[in-house]
Amino acid sequence: SIWATGTGPSFAGDLSRFESLPQNTVAMTFGDVVDCPPPDQFGILSGDDLMVRMASELNTTHAIFLLGDTEGLLDRPPDQPGAELITLWTPEQKIAGKHDSALDVTGGIFLKIASASAISKHVENVWLIDGRQPQRVLQLIRTGKTRGTRVIG
């Protein structure tokens, strides 16, 4: 990325490009490879860290994390029998999970929920929903409700 350097929520980067978006625009973000200060040459800026900065620095009404393999936050990994959707999550609730840093270098579900919790201090509507069901984004924005997990700080 040419506009951001470093990794983590305190990465260096100017978010003003997002301020000039037309009203009622849904900005979609994702992580990317970025330059890093020495001794590192590059790193992966997590989309979760980008969302934390956007939520705290911009006039954000919704923060929606689109998940690729589940309807929202589950009480245990989706491949475990009996995994159930948590419809309302607070940081006091513990979840069973695992993170394979060989596959996901940015923190997996644990970074995602930590980021969502931080965002919920600035943004009322913070959700983790099924990215395979794009109509749920529209449903959430239009009605304030959908199937997934709402995060409360």
Regions found by a protein language model. Name each.
Residues 1-153:
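C-terminal catalytic "cap/lid" subdomain
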